[in-house]
Amino acid sequence: MDYYDVLGVSKTASPEEIKKSYRKLAVKYHPDKNPGDAEAEKRFKEVSEAYEVLSDPQKRESYDRYGKNGPFAGAGGFGGMGGMGNMEDALRTFMGAFGGEFGGGGSFFEGLFGGLGEAFGMRGDPAGARQGASKKVHITLTFEEAARGVEKELLVSGYKTCETCLGSGAASEQGIKCCDRCKGSGQIVQSRGFFSMASTCPECGGEGRVITDPCSNCRGQGRIKDKRNVHVQIPAGVDSGMRLKMEGYGDAGQNGAPSGDLYVFIDVEAHPVFERRGDDLILELPIGFVDAALGMKKEIPTLLKEGMCRLTVPEGIQSGTILKVKNQGFPNVHGRGRGDLLVRVSVETPQNLSEEQKELLRKFATTEKAENFPKKRGFLDKIKGFFSDFAV
């Protein structure tokens, strides 16, 4: 692997050209833009390894003179044992290449990756500033609540900002000092061959500061445990598996960082009569064979406030036929109208007949005509045709 080829630059490229090419390729292959893509992850590590060497004048001179396995390359060459296999190292190189653009609350990554850079710890927050953890709760709704929308009150446990120290963790301003070991950065940088390795400062735990006079209420944590009631407005049309995001209702952040979020996961109970399919409702309607033959008008249940609607069943309807009632289904959760009520007709054959009923049916059978049963007649015609062909 030639580092110049990896970055797509010539051997006489200036530091600015090398940096420009690296930044373009690193953004292209960054894992946040290519989730689950092993080839992109490999390329991201390769361009980071190449930039780590070519961006340093001393390493570049040694590489130009001796190649990857030069006398200053370390035990496994410039890339260590088998190259830059650690994604953390590659990401650190990436952050270093963009310099001050990580400031302003991570705005660079929010613009580049839609905020996904936070998953790799790329927020531009001060040392020790940690966003509060997000919380998740599950809520079960009745079928009717999901259809009409409802407000629920939830009891949520977590952490809130200490009101005594306002989240600083110290009893007074004088009770906080800059960490002497890391000089406020929260990290200790060590050189390993040609690479620089950063690790969390053991003195301050990565916060960049040391509390000498802790707050008595939160014991220096800046947060205290808390339980609170949260009102959640559930929109009409939700379904099982959906979730609602309530920004800022999670645990309080530390050292000025924002609070986490609250995720409400929805589960909807089954209904004894209706079945849901998207925004449509399915109702199984059993009817007798007389009603199926003669037709009828039937009051059927709905989820609307009226509770019932009148359905016309045409004469001669067959079992399995679906009748549509417009705009009597579930409301769309995004406010785009309602679904339909789909009534699936099931013609029930009578059972446990008395002798009188059986006799009436036998008399009826003597009056049957072929046009009364078009499917039956069509089937018999097919059978006749089949045996005629077979005989030939």
UniProtKB/Swiss-Prot annotation:
Positions bound to Zn(2+) 1: 162, 165, 215, 218
One Pfam family linked to the record: DnaJ
Stretches forming CXXCXGXG motif repeats: 162-169, 179-186, 201-208, 215-222
UniProt keyword annotations, A-Z: Chaperone, Cytoplasm, DNA replication, Metal-binding, Repeat, Stress response, Zinc, Zinc-finger
Protein name: Chaperone protein DnaJ
UniProt entry tagged with the keyword Zinc-finger: yes
NCBIfam families linked to this entry: DnaJ_bact, PRK10767.1, PRK14284.1
Assembly information from the UniProt record: Homodimer.
PANTHER family, A to Z: CHAPERONE PROTEIN DNAJ, DNAJ HOMOLOG 1, MITOCHONDRIAL-RELATED
